[in-house]
UniProtKB/Swiss-Prot annotation:
Changes after translation: Proteolytically cleaved to yield at least three forms (BBRPI-A, -B, and -C).
Temperature dependence as stated in the record: Thermostable at neutral and acidic pHs.
A GO cellular component annotation in the UniProt record: extracellular region
Record function comment: Shows inhibitory activity towards serine proteases, such as trypsin, chymotrypsin and subtilisin. May form a trypsin-inhibitor complex in a molar ratio of 1:1.
Protein name, UniProt field: Protease inhibitor
Keywords: Protease inhibitor, Repeat, Secreted, Serine protease inhibitor, Signal
Annotated spans, 2 X 32 AA approximate repeats: 177-304
Secretion signal, residue range per the UniProt entry: 1-24
Amino acid sequence: MKTIRTGMMTLAALAVLGTNVVSATSEPVKELSVNVNGQHIEQAAIFDKGQQTVLVPLRDVAESLGFQVKWNAETKAAEVNKGAIFSYAKVGEDRYPFAKMYKTLGAEPRLLNGNTYVPVAFVDEILQAEVNVTDDAVTVVDEESDVAPVRTGTITTLNKREDGGVSFQLNGYETGIILHVDKETKITTADGKELKPEDLQLGMEVEATHQKFMAMSMPQSGAVSIVVKSGLETPEVLGTAGKVASIDKDQEGSYKMLVEGQALAENAPEKVALIVGKDTKIVSAKDNKELAPEDLKAEMKVFAYYGPKLTRSLPPIGVAEKIVVE
């Protein structure tokens, strides 16, 4: 039996979050995006508060994994079949055929908006695929697929070459990966709008899938798909990566942080003083967890992003839009 990995937020924490989806019992549930073998699935997964588990749309997920799915009107069950694997999901029954016996998964299928939803454990234990669950996404990977699971995080460095090629670093130096973008890479916004490689910017939060092969030095791979979840407000993003030389809090509650290191954009300084306020987004490169200004300390390694409006002083002073902490 493989293990379903759950990161960033426990199922108990998911239970307190609501969304606009309505279940068969009219109880609000939490929506999660679904990605199978690098491809986004339009039908969202949901968190079933009553059963304390995530449910995924059976047909969309199973068919994306190469299974045949059909509805058996006589037994009132959704059947799945691929090779030696046959099973079914019947609403109201925690009982699933597998390898000439029955398994219980601790949760029952649900019928929502005319679609059969199954516990995420069904994908792992019955469909035999690798599953990763975070606070807002379910990633499914067929063990035979050449696509690695989705990585979510921030574009910390960005290299746009004269030949039109683009490569970027996701989530910093220590825990990140370098992804190469080519004409085959599918780039979209979260609502499905197509983007071009040149639309990528420093500080963007993205979901990226890549090929499983990676170089032996710092991990590098070709990006298969990129979904831009959010970007910074300024159209021209500057950035500086380095150590926090100092950070001080003023009487109004804002922080002033001095960063010394490497310029990440053509017009960016290597040394910059940044105002860190309530609108500054601060995240950890390791797990994308949101941090507070008071979590910033001297000597921390950071990637700081800001707009082009800087004072003419030395060092120049600006307003931090986003900070990624290594």
